[in-house]
């Protein structure tokens, strides 16, 4: 499986997870390797899925941690990590974030 990180995902990962960024990324990749379709499809976002990851800095587990958004390209065995939210900040996407993710999904699918 090949993992691809969008620039918005990488920025948010380092902004939110800070010194735990590598640990969070490793946990996300491990979860997706065991089940790439684990996240639920988000309606209207072109195949983007949403799943949870824990925030080791808080020690709260997945429910109080991060929400990450990704695309799974089964035929290419690729996963594109597209965005990350902190549960304390928001449990879901605002209109601007939805617009960004639709654009990232369209761009990723056109490259496939």
Briefly describe each language-model feature range.
Residues 87:
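Short, conserved catalytic or interaction motifs in soluble domains
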Residues 65-84:
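Short, hydrophobic/aromatic-rich beta-strand segments within well-structured domains
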């Amino acid at each position: 499986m090949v993992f691809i990180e969008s620039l918005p995902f990488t920025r948010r990962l380092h902004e939110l997870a800070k010194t735990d960024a590598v640990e969070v990324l490793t946990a996300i990749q491990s979860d997706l390797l065991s089940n790439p379709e684990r996240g639920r499809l988000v309606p209207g976002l072109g195949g983007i899925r949403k799943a949870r990851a824990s925030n080791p800095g808080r020690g709260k587990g997945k429910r109080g941690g991060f929400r990450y958004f990704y695309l799974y390209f089964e035929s290419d065995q690729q996963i594109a990590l597209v965005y990350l939210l902190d549960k304390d900040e928001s449990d879901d996407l605002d209109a601007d974030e939805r617009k960004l993710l639709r654009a990232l999904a369209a761009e990723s699918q056109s490259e496939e």
